[in-house]
């Protein structure tokens, strides 16, 4: 399979750490071809660009919030012809043509039994649900 891993919307913090861990993990998955789109922050965070030959690295700009202006990403996708696109976290501000899977990292929407959640007032809990 040809898989695009999209990190172009990631800027700092835990998202960068999670994406870096994914990049380390895919080094050992040699039966797929990975095309990794890196944000400027991700590119500067990578310790080494020494990746195996089944991983292709692209330094990209941060995507525009107007998805029609993301020509570079669209052009790359058309030339790669991936089987799917995996965006580490959303929102991506880019709508690929290929099937798209997007990660989700806001635990409060998943784990309402967290101690933090119990301390929220009714209004804030309602806002999180909506």
Predicted regions and their residues:
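A basic- and aromatic-enriched beta-loop-alpha substructure that forms the phosphate/nucleotide-
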Residues: 87-93, 103-108
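Short, glycine/charged-enriched secondary-structure capping and boundary segments
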Residues: 18-21, 49-53, 95-102, 115-118
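Active-site donor-binding segments of glycosyltransferases and PAPS-dependent sulfotransferases
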Residues: 4, 19, 29-91
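A short, glycine/small-residue-rich beta-strand->loop->alpha-helix junction that serves as a flexible
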Residues: 6-20
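Cofactor-binding loop segments of dinucleotide-utilizing enzymes, especially the Rossmann-like FAD-
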Residues: 8, 39-41, 105
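Short catalytic/ligand-binding loop motif for oxyanion handling, primarily in non-cytosolic enzymes
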Residues: 12-14, 43-46, 93-96, 109-112
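Acceptor-binding helix/loop patch of EC 2.4 sugar-transfer enzymes
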Residues: 101-129
């Amino acid at each position: 399979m040809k898989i695009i891993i999209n990190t172009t919307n990631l800027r700092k913090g835990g998202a960068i750490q999670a994406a870096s861990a994914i990049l380390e993990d895919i080094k050992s998955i040699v039966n797929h071809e990975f095309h990794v789109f890196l944000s400027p922050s991700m590119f500067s965070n990578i310790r080494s660009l020494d990746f195996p030959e089944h991983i292709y690295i692209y330094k990209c700009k941060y995507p525009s919030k107007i998805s029609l202006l993301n020509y570079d990403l669209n052009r790359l996708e058309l030339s790669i012809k991936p089987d799917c696109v995996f965006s580490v976290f959303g929102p991506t501000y880019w709508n690929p043509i290929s099937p798209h899977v997007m990660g989700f990292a806001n635990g409060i929407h998943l784990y309402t039994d967290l101690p933090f959640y119990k301390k929220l007032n009714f209004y804030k809990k309602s806002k999180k649900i909506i």
